[in-house]
Amino acid sequence: ENETRVNLPGEVPLSIFTSDMWDEYTARCIGCGRCNYVCPTCTCYTMQDVYYTDNGKVGERRRVNASCMVDGYTNVAGGGEYRKKHGDRMRFKTMHKIYDFRKRFGYNMCVGCGRCDTVCPEYISFSNIINKVTAKVEEVQNEN
């Protein structure tokens, strides 16, 4: 059971996306992806071509679990990469779980189980990240 109570925000203003709060995770996160692999709601995947040794002209394309937190996940042709910094990846993952998913389906993706908190070798608490976002949302709302 997760000892940290997760307070999910209601509406998330777009200013949270550019907040400097994400810089902390550029320094702390090592991009191992453990948080994604234990998360019951993470669904990132990549495609992998497997060729059979019997006949190199025959094979299959497999869907393989992946992690938006690891190096190489956002690589594109021509040597580009969308999210090089770990803080940018953390922002993407967080906002996907509490903003994008909610906007599409009407509820948050994070269930607050705390598995990600338990496995992080850098002791980054995703539960606390969500609570920080909630506090930042309240701060922005109070300014307006």
List each language-model region with its residue ranges:
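Internal, non-catalytic "lid/hinge" segments that mediate substrate recognition, gating
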Residues: 1-5
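Ferredoxin-type iron-sulfur electron-transfer modules in oxidoreductases and energy-metabolism complexes
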Residues: 6-27, 45-144
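Basic (Lys/Arg-enriched) interaction patch that binds polyanionic ligands
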Residues: 27-47
